[in-house]
Design a protein with these regions (language model features):
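Bacterial Sec-dependent N-terminal signal peptides
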Residues: 1-28
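Sec-dependent signal peptide cleavage junction
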Residues: 21-56
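Ser/Thr/Asn(+Pro)-rich, low-complexity disordered segments
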Residues: 45-75, 182-199
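Ligand-recognition surfaces built from glycine- and aromatic
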Residues: 48-62, 142-144, 156-160, 267-306
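Secretory/extracellular carbohydrate-interaction modules
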Residues: 86-88, 94-211
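Short tryptophan-centered beta-strand motifs in secreted/extracellular beta-sheet-rich domains
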Residues: 145-147, 240-249, 253-255
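Short, aromatic/His-centered strand-loop micro-motif at the edge of beta-sheets
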Residues: 207-243
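Short strand-turn-strand beta-turns centered on an Asx-Gly dipeptide
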Residues: 256-261
Length: 306
């Protein structure tokens, strides 16, 4: 026959066992929650690292709005440009936004100006052969460039309009023989294409001959060419992402916005431009010298084909 004392002992034993089992279960649950939290944090970190722009920089150099030891614009060529994200000099002007999966090109007025311009840039220059500016292409050889772009931020002028910037270019270049023929000190030739982000719209400008009967030698001089009237696409992109394509072939240049609007250039001016070599440019060639002005341009994708 059980006594009250024995029942009490039995109760305490059962209670003790239940308490320990419950403590173990709580500990297991806490450990599971802790493991899940760690896993989620790892996934978030992994996800952030994975948002990379679709841009191969191995055939581009960049010019930044900061000067080097010689007082000239600071440039980074391949292969060093591949480490732009950790380059302390580049970081304020060309940096990775891993949340958006884009490279941001940041430009503002500084003393860092290239020859033949008053404006500054954080801009890529195509190098078909890495580290070499002397290998370029002609219209007859053909070329294609595509970019996925967005204006991230821009200052405004006194009238309330956003400052404009050039986001893509095709720049002409004299061969060494052409340079020597006309006695020019460098290989610079005019840009046949400038694509602007202009107060939320995309504006295109090209070159036209002042005299369509000029000789081949006369064509090599920059003053043989004039700016055209320019063209605005109907779509307003504002600060939204958009896609630009540039297709070049013999005597023809086509610019496409978002796969729906086209601007085609062909005829005598394009045909005679065939005398020049060319290279692509892309980024943020900022078109203001106003104090405090700036712009930031995102590139999610940039590809070139020849």
């Amino acid at each position: 026959m059980y006594t009250l004392k024995s029942y009490t002992g039995l109760f305490l034993l059962v209670f003790s066992i239940c308490f320990h089992l419950n403590a173990q279960n709580n500990s297991a649950v806490e450990q599971t929650l802790l493991d899940q939290t760690k896993t989620q944090k790892k996934k978030k970190k992994k996800k952030r690292k994975g948002r990379q722009p679709k841009i191969d920089l191995s055939h581009w150099k960049v010019t930044l709005p900061v000067t080097n030891d010689q007082g000239k614009p600071y440039e980074i060529e391949p292969p060093e440009i591949l480490d732009y994200a950790t380059n302390e000099i580049a970081k304020p002007y060309m940096y990775l936004d891993d949340r958006k999966g884009a490279i941001v090109f940041h430009s503002m007025p500084t003393a860092s100006k290239t020859a033949n311009t008053k404006y500054t840039r954080s801009e890529l220059r195509e190098q078909m052969v890495p580290g070499d500016n002397n290998t370029n292409w002609t219209f007859e050889e053909g070329a294609y460039m595509k970019g996925r772009i967005a204006m991230e931020a821009s200052s405004k002028d006194d009238s309330g309009k956003y400052h404009r910037t050039i986001i893509m270019q095709i720049h002409g270049r004299l061969t060494n023989e052409q340079r020597d023929l006309i006695g020019q000190k460098d290989n610079n030739a005019p840009p046949i294409l400038k694509i602007y982000w202009d107060n939320g719209k995309i504006r295109v400008k090209t070159k036209v001959l002042k005299n369509i009967n000029a000789s081949d030698e006369e064509l090599l001089h920059e003053d043989a060419w004039d700016n055209d009237a320019g063209f605005n696409f109907e779509q307003k992109v504002d600060f939204n992402a958009f896609t630009l394509e540039v297709k070049v072939s013999k005597g023809k240049m086509v610019i496409i916005l978002n796969g729906t609007e086209y601007k085609v250039y062909k005829g005598i001016h394009m045909e005679r431009w065939g005398i020049f070599e060319n290279y692509f440019k892309a980024g943020n060639y900022f078109q203001s010298r106003e104090e405090g002005s700036f712009s930031k341009v995102r590139f999610y994708q940039l590809e070139v084909k020849h």
